[in-house]
Amino acid sequence: MGDSPYEIMNELRKRESGLDMAYVVRSANQQVPAGVRKVVYGSADWVSMLARSKYLVSNNNLPEFFAKRDGQVYLQTWHGTPLKRLGSDITTGAASSFYVSAMAREAAGWDYLVSPSPFCSEVLPRALGFSGKVLESGYPRNDRLVTESETRGRVRASLGVSDSEVLVLYAPTWRDSKRTMSGAWAGVNFFDASLPAGFRLMFRGHNNTKSAHKSALAGGAIDVTNYPDVTDLFLAADVLVTDYSSVMFDFSVTGKPMAFLVPDLAEYEANRGFYFDFRAEAPGPLFSSASELVAALGNLGDYSAKYSAWQKKFNPHEDGKSAVRVVNLVWGA
């Protein structure tokens, strides 16, 4: 459990708002906070709650059959700052007309869209076809990156990682061009080099490749693909290694080092398109092989100026109070 809807729910709980709150889970075995109703995704109760709820809070699209009724308020938090182009901004042929029109239909039902930055406030409404109210509040899911300190030790202990070890989180995104014969997304893993003594590796497969991540898992890595809250992993890690994933924007709230393993950079950019010059603005070094990256892990270079510029551009509101601002704006202070 996690992400912005969860943090918004927790803020409402703190305020004893009196709202009857339900939280959607994928499995009946998942736990929800006291006083919150558990609703299993795909169940009859879930369909009923979609129809009856006054407020809907989601970080992704609702099912195609859903039609917002009069009086419902739909708060869309979205699920990350984009490097790669989205929706109608994709000009490379990677997006079908069906996808673009379906996205626009979905966005037409949103009343509010949460944004972490002026960059997203400009890009997301245009790309997704949204014309409602943008709440440039910061991402509620990132509040804990600012406010929590005890989580780091707890998570590392649960993973069997000592305080003295350097914990590297490898979190690659999925590829439009990589699918199996069945149509599922293929796993992605370019981290094929061993870490030196004193370093440990966590592997976090993308949600789209969960069914394939086992075969992609780097040897000796700690598999955290199904760990429930990636924010815990950001707090536990000392270094992030990613490629084009939006985790780069969230992790940068911590101020900890990042490196980018991008052997297919030219191909990926040509296929999807980027919103900015990634090579010029990246807040850490870019590597074309894992062996090069591992050799440089002890000294990733001075990226302080680029890192600071990155945070100002993409994380200007991340002060630990984003959920407070969203709740104030939607439900009233």
Which residues does each predicted region cover?
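A donor-sugar binding/catalytic signature common to diverse glycosyltransferases
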Residues: 56-78, 82-85, 227-272
